[in-house]
């Protein structure tokens, strides 16, 4: 369990849903230290997204998404695209220990 004093405020579900609709995200999950007991004031928020197949985002838009998420969570974020999880061990660990906040 993450101590309340060090846990970031997770935006309300409707804010996450609006963000996902805007960026054509079909699934939005948290993973990593935010869900474990080792989250601290210096931790970033690990976010896994699954984009719609026709989402045309370039590196520029990806950077915009990260900046918007930093504002929403009030701290640094590590944004990972589900299709980019190529290492089978890391993929297994993330997919089995995530918390889905939005699914279209």
Features from the language model and the residues they span:
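Catalytic core of pol beta-like nucleotidyltransferases
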Residues: 1-27, 36-37, 41, 52-104
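Conserved histidines in hydrophobic membrane contexts and catalytic metal-binding motifs
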Residues: 30
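N-terminal beta1-alpha1 ligand-phosphate binding loop
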Residues: 33
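Short hydrophobic/aromatic beta-strand micro-patches
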Residues: 48-50
